[in-house]
Amino acid sequence: MRINPTTSGSGVSTLEKKNPGRVVQIIGPVLDVAFPPGKMPNIYNALVVQGRDSVGQPINVACEVQQLLGNNRVRAVAMSATDGLTRGMEVIDTGAPISVPVGGATLGRIFNVLGEPVDNLGPVDTSTTSPIHRSAPAFIQLDTKLSIFETGIKVVDLLAPYRRGGKIGLFGGAGVGKTVLIMELINNIAKAHGGVSVFGGVGERTREGNDLYMEMKESGVINEENIAESKVALVYGQMNEPPGARMRVGLTALTMAEYFRDVNEQDVLLFIDNIFRFVQAGSEVSALLGRMPSAVGYQPTLSTEMGSLQERITSTKEGSITSIQAVYVPADDLTDPAPATTFAHLDATTVLSRGLAAKGIYPAVDPLDSTSTMLQPRIVGEEHYETAQRVKQTLQRYKELQDIIAILGLDELSEEDRLLVARARKIERFLSQPFFVAEVFTGSPGKYVGLAETIRGFQLILSGELDGLPEQAFYLVGNIDEATAKAMNLEMESNLKK
């Protein structure tokens, strides 16, 4: 943790014992601290408990002030384990909120909630820090233009386009390709937009965080040889950490992303996995602070906490933060206050389907379940909108016919329906795409497909011009020209076999 939120601070060593307090009560991760009269810290100030435990090991626990109790006492939430703390230990008020390192030096590194590196690669080579608590950009600073954020992934750009500076909910179970999709987006924004990414692991499994780091190194998203050329900074607050850390780790990641947007004037991708855990941690802290619970046991400040995080994720005249948030839905109940509050902030939803993953169609994005508020003719244009609607209609009709096909077979369908089914199967396969980050295990070179190329390809399939090509020619290709070339190769191979 950096104490001084300026470009000159040199970390915790700058602590001065000008305003010491004493621990008077410890209840799990919550501490009550007494300060001298007239020396009370502000809400959100970082406190540091220093001392030695019963076996002489040094203790250095950072806390954040949450309540002023009266009688010169404050209640603070610890950001790390409170094991070994005792009443009477000295507490120092740092005079500022938790501040974390920001800038290019954070790329390729893993941090905890306090901005301390946890990857055993030494200290972070920067003195620039920023406080994790700040206001959302003023209305006059916002960029209100509605523009599409091109990802180079066909199914996303055509059917559920992302808004530049928007928020996208990513829904998917285990093993359907969520991590690979996240890594491809990180890779594509770096190549096409010259942007960077920040990944906030909020209350996730330590194993998953480790897997993601290893996969990013394998795929080149994190460059081990030259760490400065990496495209992503990772911030983790895992499941085993106290609720204070899980509640604030999202703000740490967001603070790093804001610096890239506001100072470096870049487009930034911010991943939060999982936004539900942010709410869950807030609920735990709220109960520990003695607040009256609200609906379903959630904190009464749920909407305020969510709003203060989400409103900072936006486009300004300098750059944009586009956020992709994994959303866990407890017991599949979309009316639960946690997902319901999240939905109010989302511009698009990307739903990953286990059925498509089972067919081997990757990315396994469900074209009918995924939605976007950007898919309107006045925003994307008539051509894009019409093509997307026709693709959805074709796939919906194919879905309706599948029961008949399963019972009676294709031959019982009318000529018109048989043609529609053939085109729908081509569309389904053409929605698949080889990924750059998956090259290591598929052997197929990755493809970035521009939006204009994507629209042209689907228009050709819908018009019937490609009815004569086999459907396997459309599987795992980039643009439509590759599909026609693949069809010719398949034909040549079959002729040689004869």
UniProtKB/Swiss-Prot annotation:
Subcellular locations according to the entry: Plastid, Chloroplast thylakoid membrane
SMART domains (alphabetical): AAA
MF annotations from Gene Ontology: ATP binding; ATP hydrolysis activity; proton-transporting ATP synthase activity, rotational mechanism
Keyword list, A-Z: ATP synthesis, ATP-binding, CF(1), Chloroplast, Hydrogen ion transport, Ion transport, Membrane, Nucleotide-binding, Plastid, Thylakoid, Translocase, Transport
GO cellular component, one term: mitochondrion
GO annotation terms (biological process): proton motive force-driven mitochondrial ATP synthesis
InterPro entries per the UniProt record, alphabetical: AAA+_ATPase, ATP-synt_VA_C, ATP_synth_F1_bsu, ATPase_a/bsu_AS, ATPase_alpha/beta_chains, ATPase_F1/V1/A1_a/bsu_N, ATPase_F1/V1/A1_a/bsu_N_sf, ATPase_F1/V1/A1_a/bsu_nucl-bd
A UniProt-annotated Pfam family: ATP-synt_ab_N
Subunit field text: F-type ATPases have 2 components, CF(1) - the catalytic core - and CF(0) - the membrane proton channel. CF(1) has five subunits: alpha(3), beta(3), gamma(1), delta(1), epsilon(1). CF(0) has four main subunits: a(1), b(1), b'(1) and c(9-12).
Name under which the protein is recorded: ATP synthase subunit beta, chloroplastic
Higher taxonomy: Eukaryota, Viridiplantae, Streptophyta, Embryophyta, Tracheophyta
